[in-house]
């Protein structure tokens, strides 16, 4: 066989040198591989569908890659033990959340769930060896899952998230003097670089509480006798802001990134925020979904899976996930329900036995 030009469809034509017969050869496997690679490349880029393949329309691209959405990528666990792992969840919409583990600049694993809870986090954590320290933003159920799955791992709360939550209670311009003093302590939280500065900050927080304890304990009593609550804290939002800082200080999750014992176990400085996973995973994922907006939820989830798989440390080739059932799915057969033969047991017709349909005589007698 020898190449003998191309057909009108662009396929290479082959001709037999002995008998002169001409034919084309279909390489279905390589074609499927090329189509899936094109889809993944489009998802991970800012190109439009018409720009992926020059000379090909967006409609043709969608038709050729329609089967590719059935292919589900999987991240195989490597068993590598990391010094630091950052955990966070991103919501595509209500009841559809993706839990993500991130370490050393790449995705480690992910898990789909309806909402962040201890069970969902535990499923993800059980597939990853326990690291020396984990950086979290305080998501629902995560602390409980860490206590049961990674009991020896140190926990560092994201200081930016704590600072943001405290500011939500105090606002940017607190009206009371204790509120302004607490806001000043809150702003200084992310600027601490040494253990001495951390100790001074904790002393300042304790001093603030002892100085304004009477202010925090002030109560307002209801004047309406029909009120459901007889009294409430007058400065409830300031109390909540202080309790948030005090709780994390008692738990020891504010300044783990400065502890000498932990720094001796790891090879790189420990992060004090979840900025790496926020900027390295969450922001690009939201940008991808914005660039390729308009997809239905199942395709958005598949797009997220492909992006995460492609940003692992050593992503497997995309064609290794292709199975025959992906591009040749079995046709769905709708079962035919036959009507039962015999008298109706329950129907809409009137019968004498019911007593509420046909009535005879005076007053039904």
Q: Can you say where each PLM-predicted feature lies in the sequence?
A:
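Short linker/helix segments within small regulatory modules
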Residues: 3-13
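RNase H-like nuclease fold core
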Residues: 15, 22, 54-152
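Short, amphipathic alpha-helical "recognition" segments used to contact nucleic acids or chromatin
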Residues: 31-47
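DNA-recognition alpha helix
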Residues: 48-55, 284
């Amino acid at each position: 066989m020898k190449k003998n030009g191309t057909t009108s469809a662009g396929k290479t034509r082959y001709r037999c040198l002995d008998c002169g017969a001409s034919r084309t050869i279909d390489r279905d496997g390589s074609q499927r591989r090329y189509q899936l690679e094109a889809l993944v490349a489009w998802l991970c880029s800012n190109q439009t569908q018409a720009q992926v393949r020059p000379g090909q329309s967006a409609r043709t691209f969608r038709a050729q890659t329609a089967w590719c959405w059935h292919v589900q990528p999987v991240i195989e666990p490597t068993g590598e033990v990391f010094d630091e792992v950052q955990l966070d969840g991103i919501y595509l919409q209500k009841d559809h959340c993706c839990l993500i583990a991130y370490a050393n600049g790449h995705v480690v694993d992910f898990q789909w769930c309806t909402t962040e809870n201890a069970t969902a986090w535990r499923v993800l954590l059980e597939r990853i060896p326990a690291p020396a320290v984990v950086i979290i933003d305080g998501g629902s159920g995560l602390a409980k899952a860490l206590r049961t799955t990674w009991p020896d791992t140190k926990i560092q709360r994201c200081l930016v998230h704590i600072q943001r939550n405290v500011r939500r209670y105090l606002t940017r311009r607190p009206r009371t003097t204790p509120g302004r003093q607490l806001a000043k302590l809150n702003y200084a939280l992310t600027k601490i670089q040494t253990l001495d500065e951390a100790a001074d900050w904790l002393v300042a927080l304790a001093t603030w509480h002892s100085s304004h304890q009477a202010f925090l304990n002030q109560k307002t009593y209801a004047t309406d006798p029909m009120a459901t609550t007889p009294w409430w804290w007058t400065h409830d939002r300031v109390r909540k802001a202080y309790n948030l800082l005090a709780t994390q200080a008692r738990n020891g999750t504010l300044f783990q990134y400065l502890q000498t014992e932990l720094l001796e176990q790891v090879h790189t400085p420990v992060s004090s925020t979840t900025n790496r996973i926020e900027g390295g995973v969450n922001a690009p994922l939201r940008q991808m979904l914005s660039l390729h907006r308009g997809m239905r939820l199942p395709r958005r989830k598949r797009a997220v899976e492909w992006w995460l798989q492609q940003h692992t440390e050593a992503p497997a080739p995309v064609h290794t996930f292709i199975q025959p059932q992906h591009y040749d799915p079995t046709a769905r057969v709708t079962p035919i329900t036959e009507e039962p033969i015999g008298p109706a047991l329950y129907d809409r017709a009137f019968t004498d036995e019911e007593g509420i349909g046909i009535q005879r005589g005076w007053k039904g007698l």
